[in-house]
Every structure is written in structure tokens, then in C-alpha cells.
Amino acid sequence: MARGCRLAARAFPAYAGLGDLLCASHHRHALELLGSPATEGWQVATGLTPAQVDANGFGLYTAAHYDELVDCPVEMGRFWRGSFTVGGVPHEFVVAGAAPSFDGERLLADTQKICEAEIAFWHADGSQPPMDRYVFMLNVVDDNYGGLEHRNSTALICGRRDL
């Protein structure tokens, strides 16, 4: 069964669970993120495929199937954003909650080296990585850590002093 979802952004930078979404049957799997005056200056980051989005990422996203739809977390809010390409795959890094002294360029350079080593190891035969793009979503908090890997993204938490 195909599913589509519509989500109006709330007044906080968090993703509402699927239970909070208003879903209706469609011919494709989709998620629509609607901006509002409360989301002025916010951006969206997700591993979902953008179908029709504005400059900040609000709009319509699609997924090939339901499993992909529910395995792509969404980050909404004010955050730093940077990118690099490894093995022909664009990688994006978004960081929410970092101090103004945060060194984004160093984080990108270090992460790029790790991704280059991983792709060289797992794809030494020259095969392409299994994703079209990859998104790192890092939430910086006072004192915590953790993360969860997804199909083409990862949702991470770290303490401010770790940056």
C-alpha cells in the first residue's frame, strides 16, 4: 500500500513521529514538510529525495517504498551545514546547537578522511557505494552522546566540549 504524509512544522526543531502525521493513500510514498511563521530561518535536512522543496528544504520529499520513508530521519531548525564528495557520493553534514567557536571546516575535513578510508575498504573493487548521497545530522547538547545509523544518513548526539 502506498502512503503519503503531510507534516506542519511545529515551533521546535524536532521531528514528529509517524504517529503524529496525517497520512493518506497516494501512488507514491511522500512526506510534505510545511513551513510557517514559527519556522522563519529554519532549514530541513533528511536523506529523503527532494521532489519539490524551497531553498530551506521545506516542501515535498519522496521515498521509493515505505521502509525508506520511515528510515530517513528529518532534522528541522537552525543549524550549520557543510558538504563534501567521496567516491562520487555527495555527503552533507548538519550541526545543530554548536557554539559559535565550532570549527565546521575541521569537522568536514576529518569526516571526509574517515569516509574516504571506509569507501576504499568496502569498495576496493571499484564498485559504487549503495547510496546516492549521505547526510550526517549532529545535535550538540550539554552532556550526552550517541547515534543511530540509517540507510543513507546518521542521527548523532555529542556534548559541546567534544567539538
Regions found by a protein language model. Name each.
Residues S83-L163:
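Juxtacatalytic substrate-recognition/specificity segment
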Residues M1-E75:
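Extended, low-hydrophobicity, Ser/Thr/Pro/Gly-biased non-transmembrane segments
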Residues E75-M76, R81-S83:
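Structured, charged N-terminal subsegments at the starts of enzyme catalytic cores
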